[in-house]
């Protein structure tokens, strides 16, 4: 067998391997929990922040739903909504990057994988960014990096606490180095935010991996996570093959990282807003303390 044939066979093998994803909920009256199999009335599930009342499984939610759970009603004001990605490298693998962008934008109604803006939480002004995994796996490209950096700089200038809700597969490979450099750019802005003595809290949701984990997701004053969220850099299989040993079953979960000091606290989604408000008050962030 030639080397070319070997690679061709490998590609065929890899093409049938699918990443485990939560099934789409759809618009029906009932929803089945992928964790415990319980069938739940969809209206009740949504009323409970899309958390299974039987087993506590946190269903994946989109950026708009996340903002509605965190921000006081009517307080969120989006920033930089016009920013949209281009295709500077003319990248193409099985499909052209430009085609992927158009399709994803059409399917999600988003320009890119993060929404940023200012809001209030229990009356306290806060800068908020929410990544959306529906947009190319929440991957971090140049627009995601630029929007996050601008938000951090605004939070620093206005001395506002900052929350970034992370949900990402990592850097966007279709943008090459333009994607990777966002790690340093965002981290630099966060360092200036830290030097200003202002609170930054990342919330790690399922999944948070790759270059996002290796940069702004782990730079918080307080690192929060949702229960059982997948959090890591490289994939489990890659690590096992490198170390040549079996990893614990709960490896790369929020609970494992908390036990080993990488996560400060795990916050159930139904308690998130009150927890954020209490943490900000504890750090001296007062209601109406700054203009949003």
From Swiss-Prot:
The note describing how and how many cofactors are bound reads:
Binds 1 zinc ion per subunit.
Annotated keywords: ATP-binding, Cytoplasm, Fatty acid biosynthesis, Fatty acid metabolism, Lipid biosynthesis, Lipid metabolism, Metal-binding, Nucleotide-binding, Transferase, Zinc, Zinc-finger
Give GO terms: molecular function aspect only. acetyl-CoA carboxylase activity; ATP binding; carboxyl- or carbamoyltransferase activity; zinc ion binding
Record-linked PANTHER family: ACETYL-COENZYME A CARBOXYLASE CARBOXYL TRANSFERASE SUBUNIT BETA, CHLOROPLASTIC
What are its E.C. numbers? 2.1.3.15
What the protein does comes down to: Component of the acetyl coenzyme A carboxylase (ACC) complex. Biotin carboxylase (BC) catalyzes the carboxylation of biotin on its carrier protein (BCCP) and then the CO(2) group is transferred by the transcarboxylase to acetyl-CoA to form malonyl-CoA.
This protein's gene is called accD
What HAMAP family does this protein's entry cite?
A: AcetylCoA_CT_beta
The annotated pathway is: Lipid metabolism; malonyl-CoA biosynthesis; malonyl-CoA from acetyl-CoA: step 1/1
Q: Spell out the InterPro entries in the cross-references.
A: AcCoA_carboxyl_beta, Acetyl_CoA_COase_Trfase_b_su, ClpP/crotonase-like_dom_sf, COA_CT_N, Znf-ACC
Where the record annotates domain CoA carboxyltransferase N-terminal, the positions are 29-292
What are the names of the required cofactors? Zn(2+)
Q: What EC class does the entry list? A: transferase
Residue positions binding Zn(2+): 33, 36, 52, 55
Tell me the protein family, please.
Belongs to the AccD/PCCB family.
State the name under which the record lists this protein: Acetyl-coenzyme A carboxylase carboxyl transferase subunit beta
Q: Zinc finger (C4-type) residue ranges? A: 33-55
Tell me the compartments it is located in: Cytoplasm
- Which organism was this protein described from? Synechococcus sp. (strain WH7803)
**Superkingdom of origin:** Bacteria
Catalysed reactions, semicolon-separated: N(6)-carboxybiotinyl-L-lysyl-[protein] + acetyl-CoA = N(6)-biotinyl-L-lysyl-[protein] + malonyl-CoA
What Pfam families has UniProt attached to this entry? Answer: Carboxyl_trans (PF01039), Zn_ribbon_ACC (PF17848)
Q: Name one GO biological process term.
A: fatty acid biosynthetic process
